[in-house]
Design a protein with these regions (language model features):
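Long, contiguous, secondary-structure-rich segments that constitute the structural scaffold
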Residues: 1-54, 115, 121-135, 139-230
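Long, low-complexity segments enriched in small/aliphatic residues
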Residues: 28-124
């Protein structure tokens, strides 16, 4: 019930007791923090009361700096000066071209997290955005005859989605952006899986797409419906 939820430390304590341990005998969250501070050098002089008095503290907060440290490394690092390594710019694996003239990147919205499995269960958060959206610059939208919140299709060499356009100057000309929280229009069905040669990370943040307005009166279909029709 609201107001009666248990803190993480209480669940951890209950689990420990079920396993036969009596070591986690905290009475409240402050006791947990005190234990953390006792074994963490950077937190040694911290306490709930000092945090409340100072509206927070910057670590390290220890015997040498009991009021916290405004700048962590002002002269050097514990192991000496930082080692700066040069990097060479490598262009994206799949740039926009005549067939797919816009560059797509993916983004997150502050209303949702990850695939939305938790945040989309909240009616308050869910009402803030439509289930899927593509951010597009006014210049590109005008060139493509796309209206604000108009129904559109987005296609790459790997996938096809239907969603709605959000016209905004937040994205530059030539770039479109799509959040990845929505199962109705999962943007990562469009993205490129080309890998970085060193880290093997896929290049999910850049690919070429073709954006078109849907026929008048046609609503965007969720990907589940598109898959059934294919």
């Amino acid at each position: 019930p609201i107001g009666e939820a248990k803190g993480d430390w209480q669940w951890l304590q209950a689990l420990a007791k079920q396993m036969g341990s009596t070591q986690l005998d905290w009475q409240n969250s402050e006791a947990v923090f005190d234990e953390m501070a006792s074994v963490t050098p950077a937190y040694k002089a911290m306490s709930y009361s000092k945090l409340e008095q100072n509206y927070g503290l910057q670590w390290p907060c220890n015997d040498e700096n009991p009021e916290g440290t405004s700048i962590l490394h002002s002269q050097s690092f514990p192991i000496g000066k930082a080692k700066l390594l040069p990097v060479n710019y490598t262009d994206v694996d799949e740039a926009a071209d005549s067939e797919y003239p816009l560059q797509l990147t993916t983004n997150r919205l502050h209303f949702h997290y990850g695939c939305g499995s938790m945040t989309r269960s909240s009616p308050l958060l869910e009402r803030e955005t439509p289930p899927g959206v593509l951010f597009i610059n006014p210049v590109d939208a005008n060139n493509l005859n796309i209206a604000h919140q108009g129904a559109i299709s987005v296609e790459s060499r790997r996938g096809y989605l239907e969603t709605r356009a959000m016209i905004t100057n937040d994205v530059p000309v030539g770039l479109v952006s799509m959040p990845y929280h929505f199962k109705e229009a999962p943007s990562n069905q469009l993205t490129n899986t080309a890998q970085d040669p060193v880290t093997k990370m896929p290049e999910l943040k850049a690919c070429a797409v073709l954006v078109k307005p849907l026929p008048a009166g046609q609503e965007p279909r969720p990907v589940q419906e598109l898959q059934q029709d294919s």
